[in-house]
């Protein structure tokens, strides 16, 4: 059976529009954006996590590890005036990463190696629509 590339792409885009999935990952673009220091080490990105939030290099020695958390923008007014809120979140994520490094079993040595070398963390956001509703902001 021959499948039209255009029809397949249209189906992917239509499904993405209706469901939010599948997550699309353009690996060439991710590798072009890889920091030069990692390129100089011969590293490359081979994939991402499921939701495409993180793109970290992997190879025979390393398995990507990133500690993620989110702030709830619906509660932005409550935490935005605290200058230490985001730095404290970053420190908390780094502490979680350190706990993993200190307690990881040998069976995940590649993940421990990556966590130790890169210390990747990420702070995302959720609740933007709820914040706009709370503030009475019309949005189309």
What positions do the PLM features span?
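Polar, glycine-rich mid-to-C-terminal structural blocks
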Residues: 1-19, 27
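Short, intrinsically disordered, charge-balanced linker/junction segments flanking boundaries
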Residues: 137-140
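Function-dense linear segments that define catalytic or interfacial modules
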Residues: 16-120, 125-135
């Amino acid at each position: 059976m021959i499948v039209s590339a255009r029809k397949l792409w249209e189906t992917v885009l239509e499904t993405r529009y209706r469901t939010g999935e599948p997550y699309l990952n353009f690996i060439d673009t991710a590798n072009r954006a890889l920091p030069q220091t990692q390129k100089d080490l011969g590293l490359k990105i081979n994939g991402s996590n499921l939701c495409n939030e993180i793109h970290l290099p992997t190879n025979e020695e390393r398995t990507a590890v990133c500690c993620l958390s989110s702030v709830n923008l619906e509660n932005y007014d409550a935490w935005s005036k605290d200058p230490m809120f985001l730095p404290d979140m970053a420190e908390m994520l780094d502490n979680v990463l350190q706990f993993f490094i200190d307690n990881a079993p040998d069976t995940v040595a590649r993940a421990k190696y990556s966590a130790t070398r890169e210390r990747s963390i990420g702070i995302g956001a959720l609740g933007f629509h709820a914040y706009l509703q709370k503030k009475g902001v019309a949005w189309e």
